[in-house]
């Protein structure tokens, strides 16, 4: 399964629409707001994770592969895989995440 699905959701991204889609697929849906340069490094989870960018840009490193995610994109992070997330936007980035 590829990590990145470009333009999975229409922009502007609607959190309720994403939450409904993810619930149907067995995922939760929560939100993060990160300032420019914020990093979350070397995480690994026992569940699969989905990420969707609402506004801004994120650089995700998943098992050594770098991905730039933009508004409307969805990223799949498999369970048991090391990953990092960084706000590479010059402004605040708003993003959604969920676990199965």
Regions found by a protein language model. Give the residues of each.
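Short acidic-glycine-tyrosine-enriched beta hairpin
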Residues: 64-79
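A short, N-terminal "cap"/entry segment at the start of jelly-roll beta-barrel domains
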Residues: 1-33, 41
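A generic "binding-loop/recognition-motif" signal
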Residues: 36, 46, 65, 81-82, ...
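Short histidine-centered beta-strand/loop micro-motifs
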Residues: 19-21, 39-45, 86-88
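Short strand-coil-strand connectors
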Residues: 25, 61-65
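Short, conserved beta-strand element in jelly-roll/cupin
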Residues: 44-60
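Ligand-binding loop in jelly-roll beta-barrel domains
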Residues: 79-100
